[in-house]
Amino acid sequence: MRTPTLSLLTIAMAGSLATATPALAAQWNLASPYGDASFHTQNTKQFAEDVTEATDGELTITVHSGGSLISHAEIKPSVRRGTVQAGEIFLSTLSNESPIYEVDTLPGLAGSYADAYDLWQASKPIITELFAKEGLMPLYAVPWPAQGIYTDFELTDAAQLEGLRVRAPNINTQRFVENLGGIPTQTEEADIPTAFSTGRVDAMITSVSTGKSMSAWDYVSNYSDANLWLPKNIIFVNKRAFDRLDDATQKAVLDAAAKAEQRGWQLSKEDSAQSAETLESRGVTVSEPNTELKQQLQAAGQQLFEDWQSRAGDQAKQLVERYRERQAQQGQ
């Protein structure tokens, strides 16, 4: 029996085709719980477009917004497992994993954009380390506008919140509500209108942005612009997926992330001003808390800060020291 052999021409052609065939482009999925109307989602989609453009299509990132692919609570575990390559979450929802994740929801610690940025720079090394232990890598973080209190009455005294069901999206906010005498209720952003209409929620602590996107004027009349804190969304990737990229593509991702962070902070500032105007134009009274209410909110926040320091230990001490040092250097 004759053994079949390949001709030299066939071998040469096969080798030529193998050499000429380009490497397959990488495709990532990025899961986000936020809808397309959110400036966060718009920024995330621009980040994805920037990556595609910078890599000439060698890496494409599909953003699945509004929880369309994965629910908020499952995004981080899914990225960790590699089910999806990237995700966006509300950072403080991880506070049950480490007190460090609560730092940007401590009332009175950072109530302005300048302070919030210093706090992010001070906390970023520790948060990056915590993510790395799970095979994850933060890309960038963007804050929501400062948090305030929505009610269907003029809020002049914290005693008015006693017994009310107050929407609180994370553990620290829930503790804050309890310190004020309210009953914390956890409700996803998309469910806010239904929660108010069914009586599951009487008031809520959130930003002017969320109030605008959720048409808060349909169920509340007042917004107390208390500048309690500026919580952040964090965008992160599966480290193995990132490591599989070549050096040029990795650099393109990091460069696009740096631009997204800078752009996102500016978008947040702009959205804060625009959202406040929208609320007022729709009949919501936007006002700063009076002196008595400010003191009551500060007292409730101080309790949280002291409790947080005791739970977070040395890491909290180091983080706050770095934060205060940055503030001192910049004369804040």
Where do the protein language model's features map onto the residues?
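Bacterial N-terminal signal peptides that target proteins for export
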Residues: 1-9
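N-terminal secretory/targeting leader peptides
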Residues: 26-117, 123-332
